[in-house]
Each structure stands twice: as C-alpha cells, then as structure tokens.
Amino acid sequence: MATSEHSDIGRRQAIRALASGAVAAVASASWVESLTALARQQAHAHAATAAIVAQNWSPSTLTAPQNDLVVALTELIIPETDTPGAKGTNVNRFIDHVLTDAQPEVRASFVRGLTWIDARSRALFKARDFLGASAEQQKTLLTRLSAEGNPDKEEAIGRDFFEAIKSMTIDGYYTSEIGLRKELGDNGQLFLPQFQGCDHHEHQ
C-alpha cells in the first residue's frame, strides 16, 4: 500500500476516534448537547455552505480574537497533513454560522468556554492567552481536557467546551468539499444541498 494510502487511513481512523469520544461525552452538559445537535443538522443539510465560502466572509457571532482562537483550536483537533486541516477547510466559519443560529444561552456557554481556555492558559503556563502559549503547552491543555476520568472540578467548563468544539469541528470538516471528497471518498454525489446524512461510523 502506498504511503499516501496509509496516511488517508490513519487520518480517517483518528477522526473516527475523535468522533466516538465526542459522542460518548456529549451529554456532559445540556448546552453541549444542544449545540452539537444543531451542528450535525447544519452539516447534514449543508445550510451553511454559501455563508462559509463567501469571499468577503466575516464572523457574525464571534469577535475577531474569538475567531482566531477557534481557528487555532480546530486546527489542533484536525491538523493539516497531506490534505488541508480544519483551518484550510474553514471550520471556524462553520462554527460561527452554527453559533449564530443557536439559542442565546448556548452561544454564551460556548463563548464562556473560549474565555475559560484563555484564563486556564494564563493560570497554567503564565501565558498571555492560549495563542500566546507554546505549541507544546497548547497540546498539554487540550490533552488534559480530553482525558477520561479527569477529576479536576476547575476544568469542568473546559471539558464541556472541548467536547462541544471537537464535535463541531468534525461536523464542520465533513461539511467541506475536501472533507467529503478526500476523506470520505465522495465522487461528487454527496456534496449537494439536499444531502441528508452519512453512513460512516463517525456520524452514527
């Protein structure tokens, strides 16, 4: 098997593992469940496509610094390999679109999670914020938040937030043409406005 084929399989397996973990923990908070359900609905209906690909795009809900943080977090979740990662497929735009359609209290919970990420970075690493932390420190924090059985009550908000953004990142990635065609092997039939679902494991 060629190296690129190994890479494709490994990437799909990694994203499946991320998805299964997100689904398993999605009931950790009601706002997480609400937001991830909305994200799946948006991804499967492709309602966000036109807004995401617009050349003059700007965030409708997130501030510019919040959007920058979402870009960084999602790229750490699905990084670029031989195919573009979350940043290259505009997952941040998908997330902003979903947040715009979400209930105000759900949006507020997500934004509170972003604020918590920056505050926790300052507390743990003496960094200005998450983006000011080193790559190693950033990965350390996200690893802590994704660890099963993490008993740290101070990180409960962060764990709920990370499960939400992880699930939304996966759905947003598969909303993109690259995610569908390169990762799922779509021949062009799935990337349609009427796409209603997906039979891959990560969307079960």
Task: List where the protein language model places each region.
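N-terminal secretory signal peptides and thylakoid transit peptides that target proteins
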Residues: 3-22
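C-terminal segment of N-terminal export signals and the immediately downstream linker at the start
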Residues: 7-8, 13, 29-72
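Structured mid-domain segments that build the active-site/substrate or prosthetic-cofactor binding neighborhood
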Residues: 25
